[in-house]
UniProtKB/Swiss-Prot annotation:
GO cellular component labels: cytosol
Name of the protein described by the UniProt record: Protein ZMO0507
Domain of life assignment: Bacteria
Family statement: Belongs to the free Met sulfoxide reductase family.
InterPro entries named among the record's database cross-references: FRMsr_CS (IPR000614), GAF (IPR003018), GAF-like_dom_sf (IPR029016), Phosphatase_reg/MetRdx (IPR051330)
One MF term in the entry's GO annotations: L-methionine-(R)-S-oxide reductase activity
UniProt source species: Zymomonas mobilis subsp. mobilis (strain ATCC 31821 / ZM4 / CP4)
């Protein structure tokens, strides 16, 4: 069992502590599924106001469900469909204030109100997966979350391939 000292007082401190902890976790394991699982658990445990966090792995032209924390989720998402599929197809971060107004949104959990999806790139800049964070609070994610989660996923991407 791991024990971490993570300060959740401010987003800046939270993301700094998460980054340090994630680097420690990843340095101990080479398996990509184990690393995604621990990353999802770390974020789920310390980031407030989330109702789902997890990974979709890029396999051909689909995103296939990977390790996650939260309710049962959609298993297969085509590139270009919904927030996750759009992030994978465009290679761009999707920060959605209100998922109910997002075109082509896939609703796996009707209680989700906002969503942040970040593509995870490997060493050759290929998209390996996306991380999907969902919140029941509209407008939950801001520029600090985008920056902080992006740094976490840059580190994870180096360990995934």
């Amino acid at each position: 069992m791991f024990s971490f000292s993570i300060n959740t007082g401010s987003k800046k401190t939270l993301y700094s502590d998460l980054l340090t902890t994630l680097k420690e976790l990843l340095s101990e394991e080479g398996d990509p599924i184990a690393n995604m699982a621990n990353t999802a658990a770390l974020i789920w445990t310390y980031m407030p106001d989330l109702n789902w966090v997890g990974f979709y792995r890029a396999i051909r032209s689909y995103l296939i469900l990977g390790p996650f924390q939260g309710k049962v989720a959609c298993v297969k998402i085509p590139y270009g469909r919904g927030v996750c599929g759009t992030a994978a197809a465009t290679g761009r971060i999707q920060c959605v204030r209100d998922v109910h107004t997002y075109p082509n949104h896939i609703s796996c959990d009707p209680s989700a109100a906002s969503e942040l999806v970040i593509p995870i790139r490997g060493r050759q800049n290929q998209i390996l997966a996306v991380i999907d964070l969902e919140s029941p609070t509209m407008g939950r994610f801001d520029a600090e979350d985008v920056e902080g989660c992006s740094r976490l996923m840059e580190v994870l991407g180096r360990f995934l391939g």
